[in-house]
Amino acid sequence: MNLLDLDYEVALDQDLNQFGIGVIGAGFIIRDCHLVAYQQAGFRVVGIASRNPARAAEVALLRGIPTVYQHYRELLKNPDIQILDIGVPPQHQPAIIREIVQHAKHVRGILAQKPLAMSYAEAQEIVELCESAGITLAVNQNMRHDHSVRGCRDLLQRGLLGEPVLGTIDMRAIPHWMPWSQDLHSLSTFVMSIHHLDCFRYWFGDPQRVMASTRPDPRTKFSHTDGINLYILEFANGCRASSWDDVWTGPVREGSQGDIGIHWRVEGTAGLARGTIGWPSYPAATPSTLDFTTRERGDYWLQPRWKQAWFPDAFRGTMGELLMAVKHQTPPPISGRDNLRTIALVEAIFTAAKEHRVVELPEI
């Protein structure tokens, strides 16, 4: 199979710089992922604001952003800003979006961070506010734009793997917990596992029920309940999915040798795909990988490769899908409305682990 036949990167129109982007936040994910990808894609960033204006000024100088605002409320007044890109902790994001919708005369789209909110009820409120204001809301579920993940989705959509039977993700990696995560009622489930849960939805659709188990991470010193997460998803068509989200990985920071990495696998009735995820090597930009084999071509593995990496290149896809949606007046694939089902799944996993029981998705 020729690499050019695999839909591993979203196709974008060439005139998306017609939209002015305003950025709220100046942390590393904005500085080193969002803005790097936007520069490479030719998107037009008009201004930036942060609760730390000095850091916003540093990022603006580094990434060529013309205007630094002392407060995001000043940024919202600029009529040349049609798109808001939010990069703030999840507990602060809903309040900012409630203010953004008051500027619907010129604001046409919002790219929110994941999780959209820390509860289904609040996420639903935000989605409905944006819909009422006529503002297109997208949620930055950027794992969908990891190139191996998107490539696997293409294989599934084209039927090359047949009917999905089993999907697994085996994560042995150490996230960099930000200080703001100490204030959340959930750590790994809403911050880390949400990537894999949304990925399973992207590949297989919505599950009927879930089972989960969790325990604290020995390395993380602040109080939390959900560090290491184990969970199983059951789908109506018989497909099953499971992830081991191991943020401990053994005492590798405490003196032992390490075995860090993320491997995924999708088995179907007509083929098998497997891959690796490159982000544990960050800040080294390491492309993810995809190998697959089918019953029709059973004598070898096909191994398409690419130079792009999840960090930063996937962020071209999330902002690009929002800009395309605004331009063509269509819902983005990562719409806020769709993301409610991801939030429901995350809450179901958290509940299943907390209450030690099977949770049906309609409960949420």
Question: Can you annotate each of these PLM segments?
Answer:
Residues 1-63:
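N-terminal Rossmann-like dinucleotide-binding module
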